[in-house]
């Protein structure tokens, strides 16, 4: 399935006139930035919200996100100049940057100490150039003039960085002659984009951004291969309200104590289980840092009947057994493992430990909470499959109001359980985020949970069309106006609160609609 190309904006599910006005404003700013250049095409990719299944994608367990209407758009001019110039409609926060091109298409060095938005574009340049080489399309990269526009909140947990990287990669490839790329290939090459800026992403964000379809959510699987499978919800008046807590979560700057530390803790937890269960070489070293993964541990435990990712009942049974194993093998050290305790269990020297776990990405910690992290991964993965089972059983029943209400209550409870684990086991929530969830549940939400990396960012709320207004008003009154008394209502409704249907994924847009 290829990334689509559209000649108009009819694929947008939100206000068509508002959308066209946004594109026309982008054209106006592009022409102001580059008066002697014309736009050849647009590339775009949306943000995403994860409905359930956080901090499990990099352990290769399936997740359930959807693409949202908020997206990153880039207007592109292709030329033969030896440079790429990137600009943004928000020039105050994203200043103009020029990236010189060399004959060898190298030199895209990323200064991890300099947190510039150009670093993310360079990530896209690296993966796009690698793909061109892989496809035997190696040649001098085209010069480009680009103006970006994005309405995915930065640091809001809605994958603004993934949307930017995917849109940038798609633009670079299209400019350099790749007019037809599969969704699978675009996902595969962009999954590693943010690794170049030191953020250890797992693949869900990029896959959801690429594979999104209108009115459909996505089951994203990582084994046996990375793929997105669209599906519809059985309740017609179901909707999701996404609220930005306005606590900015900068993954790059906080990664050593948050996101990357979870990756390391889960990797060590997997290796500790390998040792305790005597699994030896049955577990592949396939994590992002070259260690065992918690999915690999489960597959090794059930080596003769590995879960294929499709049979929901088998997956549920195996995950329940893995939760019991975690309770048996790791529960005796809930306060956390010291490095010395890890060395003893893993039979490693300090230098070997540092080389294996602490070299790939910087982390800071006092103790490593292996029990909590492993338990979260297996319980959260179980909830994803329980949601799938709920979807499959509801879709085969009648569509009465009682059935709809039953589905909403059950799915909401799974989301609430997820939030509890994210708070207590993964420790990626905080008091203010918990407060938002509590307020929402009192004002029409069936289930509310943080989404994305956490530690700030956004909350996703399950509700219905007839309750969404009450929910939004309750959050404005009891959270936003108390925490941010000077904030304007129109700013909230435009930037902090999104009521989004599942939306179209990555695509190219021609300039025909401008004619």
From Swiss-Prot:
GO cellular component, one term: cytosol
Domain of life where this protein originates: Eukaryota
PROSITE patterns: GALACTOKINASE, GHMP_KINASES_ATP
Sorted UniProt keywords: ATP-binding, Carbohydrate metabolism, Galactose metabolism, Kinase, Nucleotide-binding, Transferase
Residues binding ATP, per UniProt: 155, 157, 159-160, 249-251
Catalytic residues in the record: 205
Record-level GO BP terms: galactose metabolic process
Catalytic activity: alpha-D-galactose + ATP = alpha-D-galactose 1-phosphate + ADP + H(+)
Entry protein name: Galactokinase
Origin species: Candida albicans
Gene: GAL1
């Amino acid at each position: 399935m290829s990334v689509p190309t559209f000649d108009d904006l009819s694929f947008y599910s939100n206000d068509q006139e508002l959308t066209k006005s946004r594109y026309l404003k982008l054209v106006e700013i592009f022409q102001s930035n580059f008066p002697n250049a014309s736009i050849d095409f647009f590339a775009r990719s949306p943000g995403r919200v994860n409905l359930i299944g956080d901090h499990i994608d990099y352990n290769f367990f399936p997740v359930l996100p959807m693409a949202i209407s908020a997206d990153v758009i880039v207007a592109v001019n292709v030329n033969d100049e030896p440079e790429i110039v990137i600009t943004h409609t928000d020039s105050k926060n994203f200043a103009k940057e020029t990236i010189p091109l060399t004959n060898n298409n190298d030199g895209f060095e990323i200064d991890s100490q300099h947190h510039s938005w150009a670093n993310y574009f360079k990530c896209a340049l690296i993966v796009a150039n690698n793909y061109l080489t892989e496809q035997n399309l190696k040649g001098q990269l085209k010069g480009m003039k680009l103006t970006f526009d994005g309405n995915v909140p930065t640091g809001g947990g809605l994958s603004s960085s993934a949307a930017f990287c995917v849109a940038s990669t798609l633009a670079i490839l299209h400019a350099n002659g790749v007019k037809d790329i599969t969704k699978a290939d675009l996902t595969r090459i962009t999954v590693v984009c943010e690794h170049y800026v030191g953020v250890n992403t797992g693949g869900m964000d990029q896959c959801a951004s690429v594979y999104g379809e209108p009115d459909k959510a996505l089951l994203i699987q990582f084994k046996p291969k990375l793929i997105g499978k669209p599906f519809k919800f059985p309740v017609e008046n179901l909707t999701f309200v996404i609220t930005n807590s306005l606590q900015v979560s900068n993954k790059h700057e906080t990664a050593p104590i948050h996101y990357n530390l979870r990756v390391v803790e889960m990797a060590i937890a997997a290796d500790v289980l390998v040792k305790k269960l005597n699994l030896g070489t049955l577990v592949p070293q396939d994590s992002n840092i070259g260690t065992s993964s918690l999915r690999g541990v489960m597959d090794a435990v059930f080596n003769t009947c590995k879960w294929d990712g499709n049979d929901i009942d088998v997956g549920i049974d195996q995950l329940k057994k893995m939760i019991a194993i975690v309770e048996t093998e790791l529960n005796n050290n809930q306060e956390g493992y010291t490095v010395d305790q890890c060395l003893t269990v893993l039979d490693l020297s300090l230098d070997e430990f540092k080389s294996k776990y602490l070299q790939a990405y910087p982390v800071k910690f006092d103790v490593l909470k292996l029990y909590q992290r492993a338990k979260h991964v297996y319980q959260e993965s179980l909830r994803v499959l329980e949601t799938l089972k709920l979807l499959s059983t509801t879709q085969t029943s009648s569509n009465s109001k009682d059935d709809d209400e039953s589905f909403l209550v059950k799915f909401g409870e799974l989301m609430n359980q997820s939030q509890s684990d994210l708070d207590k086991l993964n420790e990626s929530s905080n008091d203010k985020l918990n407060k938002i969830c509590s307020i929402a549940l009192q004002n029409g939400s069936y289930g509310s949970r943080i989404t994305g990396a956490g530690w700030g960012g956004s909350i996703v709320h399950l509700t219905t069309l007839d309750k969404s207004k009450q929910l939004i008003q309750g959050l404005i009154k009891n959270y936003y106006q108390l925490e941010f008394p000077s904030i304007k209502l129109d700013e909230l409704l435009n930037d902090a609160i999104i009521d989004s249907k599942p939306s179209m994924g990555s695509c190219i847009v021609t300039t025909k609609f401008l004619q």
